[in-house]
Regions:
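Transmembrane-helix signature of 12-pass secondary carriers
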Residues: 2-249
Length: 249
């Protein structure tokens, strides 16, 4: 396998996995603003916990459940772009919010990005990676979640003495990696498997050629056609047979 081609795939995988960095950062960054926000808005413990602090988690749940819809409809790459947009506006909106409801709405938006990223990023990486390297490359996403958590704690520590509006800086700083991530996503190719699933064969061939996998075109096409045929069913995640594992999850 050509080392230059493999290097390209590694770079594309790293770029897509940066969604995990934003996941980790977004999840933890609120911790630095926790007490400041409750004091600022004089919120009750129940309201502060379930709305101000908890709204991002509700967004994550919805994003994870429904994130597969845009990933399949508009593609993995376009979904990853929109995830970056969600994170960016969530950071700016949260930083500029002057009341808890507006703050919670923008945190919910960020949560949607978190949830959707758990679907789109691993799917994209697994679809561009050679089978033998798939596990290693998808692991970039998990690594970046942990890295994002670490950097968020460090960022909060460095901004803790930034005055009475330190919480705004803590929340707003996420806009920087969100913008960088979004711009980088524009440089990666679309998933060849998604292109084939939409019968965009010529585009898929070009991407596979750039990845040194053009010889696999027919095999991948047959595999996707088989999967599409097998997928014709009325079962959904909410079907009776999935109810127990869904509740446990």
């Amino acid at each position: 396998f050509n080392i230059l081609i493999m290097n390209k795939i590694v770079v594309w995988s790293l770029i897509a996995s940066l969604a995990g960095f934003l996941f980790g950062f977004d999840t933890v960054v609120i911790s630095g603003a926790d007490k400041k926000l409750q004091e600022l808005w004089n919120s009750s413990d129940a309201f502060h916990g379930t709305v101000v602090m908890g709204m991002a988690l509700w967004g994550t749940v919805f994003g994870a459940i429904f994130g597969g819809i845009p990933a399949n409809k508009i593609g993995r790459k376009n979904t990853l772009i929109w995830i970056g947009v969600l994170f960016f506006f969530s950071a700016i909106g949260s930083a500029l919010a002057n009341d808890p409801i507006v703050f919670a709405i923008f945190r919910f938006v960020g949560g949607l990005g978190v949830g959707a990223s758990t679907i789109a990023a691993p799917a994209y990486i697994s679809e561009i990676a050679p089978a033998k390297d798939r596990g290693k490359l998808v692991a970039f996403y998990q690594f970046n979640i942990v890295l994002g958590i670490l950097i968020a704690f460090l960022s909060n520590y460095l901004l803790r003495n930034a005055g009475e509006n330190s919480w705004r800086w803590m929340m707003g700083v996420q806009a920087i990696p969100s913008l960088i991530y979004t711009l980088f996503i524009f440089t990666i190719p679309k998933s060849p498997r998604w292109l084939l699933s939409k019968s965009r064969n010529e585009e898929a061939k070009k991407v596979l050629a750039s990845m040194g996998q053009l010889a696999d075109f027919e095999a991948i096409k047959r595999e996707i056609e088989h999967d599409n045929t097998s997928a014709v069913t009325n079962d959904t995640i909410f079907s009776k047979k999935y109810r127990t594992p869904l509740l446990l999850a």
